[in-house]
Amino acid sequence: MRATARLDCVNAPADQYAADILVDFARTLLVRAGVRDDIAGDVAAILVDGDLLGHTTHGLALLPAYLGEIERGTMLRDGAPAVINSRASAETWDGHRLPGPWLALRALDRAIDLAADQGTGTIVIRRSHHIACLATYAKRAADRGIVALIYCSDPSVCSVAPFGAVSPVFTPNPLAAGIPTSRDPILIDISASLTTNGLTARLYKAGQKLPHAWVQDAQGNATDDPGVLFAEPPGTLLPLGGLDAGHKGYALALLIEAMTAGLAGVGRADPAEGWGATVFVQALDPQTFGGAAAFGRQMDWLVDACHGATPRPGVDRVRLPGEHGMARFREQRANGVRLHPTIMPALAPWCEKLGATML
């Protein structure tokens, strides 16, 4: 079936697939696992968007784990979030461990609707499941002319040590922002740690090193060896800034914990419920503030100023956050998505189990 998958990708190599074919493939697996069709479609679209943007650990690489969670009943197949608190421009939801990408998309849409009426809209979700690549939501908001902020933490996992410590307290605690401009949006997608659990696990399994000393062993020695995270006692991910300036990442992690678990009222102070997420989604309509035109003028000036900044030696040109991802998004939309070589082999057993045709 691989040839069929490549019909929309002229001259695509054998390891590239049309994005729409991948979305349908992922949706089919989820539906056959019992997920409601509209939920499955949203989850599939977000995962493929992650790969389109180049976030290969947070795209279809997550699908085998999601299917495992569904099979175990720790990610629900059907249902709806409950609104447990609300005001004119803010709501708190209980996600009931429904698929995170679907919940996050619903939260983004609701936040944008609130922003259209109130200027800002904020949705906080407790007990969501994992929400995949945060930049995908930021892009969707920015494409609609909305500034979006998305924060996420997983209260059931701890792999990042506070600055000055060797024992873990946090997850990488990612944050994303989508900022519209008259050209491509600025897409910020970073975490409070130097690297992520997904990347370190992938490199460890492949017997490879990290690009830099982004983790520390249990004695507090910085290293590029992801294996220290799987040793006994385990090491930890270093906060953003590393051993020298990790107080910055530490502070950012605390902020994200406050904006997710703190505002949601459910987090690390409670018994762990398994892999999941506590989520903060905020939408801001520039028209409510200085006006959309003025916002665009300021952001366009900033884009031009950054692009026009003199590069330091060894740098060809200055780029903006998300610039590479947007270029990759367009290129892969046109020519096919290049999947990481571990993804399809990991999905093959699920195709067999669920009676789906492998691409």
Task: List where the protein language model places each region.
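Catalytic-core signal marking the mid-to-C-terminal active-site face
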Residues: R2-A5, C9-F25, A258, A269-L359
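Acidic, glycine/proline-rich low-complexity segments that act as flexible tails and inter-domain linkers
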Residues: A3-A18, D24, T28-V43, V48, ...
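Active-site cofactor/substrate anionic-group-binding motifs, chiefly glycine-
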Residues: H58-I112
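A generic, well-ordered mixed alpha/beta core segment in the N-terminal half of proteins
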Residues: E91-S182
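Glycine-rich phosphate/pyrophosphate-binding loops
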Residues: I146-S159, E257-W275
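Phosphate/diphosphate-binding glycine-rich loops and adjacent basic-rich segments that engage nucleotide
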Residues: C158-F230
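Secondary-shell segments that build the walls of catalytic and ion/ligand-binding clefts
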Residues: Q208-R268
